[in-house]
């Protein structure tokens, strides 16, 4: 059952420990645009990402190693729906002032479910069904739902194709956080000066482009698992031979968004039609960092997710 290097023989694994996997995946999106007046574009779109994964593993009884005579089945079902609605209006004034105004809303709904079961001590290769084992492990069954909502708007302005200003604001909400902290506001602003188009640089033939840029903004991070903010209980436990439930995770009513503030100042240029140079300075500060925080073992828990620090 081993080759000369001490590894499992692939033929042995295929014949005596077969593992069958199958996945059905769906990705798709639809959208609808209308232009009721000149410069106004209204768009609605829907997207779906879904899959159904199944795995069947068997270790036939005639295998030479401990753990033979085992069958396991598992599946995972996941889907995520994204709904986006935007309205964008572009217009100009006096031929030099150009505006783009956008307002939008987005919702993302995600659901996931996992299930697995294992049956042991099977004695007949012809009866490798889950009900044929003399012993079975406690099945694993998990599921979660999460929802993300956002309202956002942007304004872009340019004058004479040389001065540019961008403003953006958004309000994001996530079901992952505590009830009173699910919503947070974020914003950004930026400006760019195309100096090459100024009159005092028109006669500099070797200078192809020269741009000065500055931006400042905030963003949020909600990268935690579902229900980290809630105090949960678990079942399937025995105490003095009797089934019961017990606390499984520590809740945190103060859990909120991690936020990042970023300042960026840069200059870019191109000379002699071949050499490009770009210099940037940035400063980034992260507040309310989401991390696992160790707890005293006297609490009965190892850690909890908290907003622990700034960096």
Regions found by a protein language model. Give the residues of each.
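Extracellular/periplasmic, surface-exposed regions of secreted and cell-surface proteins
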Residues: 2-59, 68-311
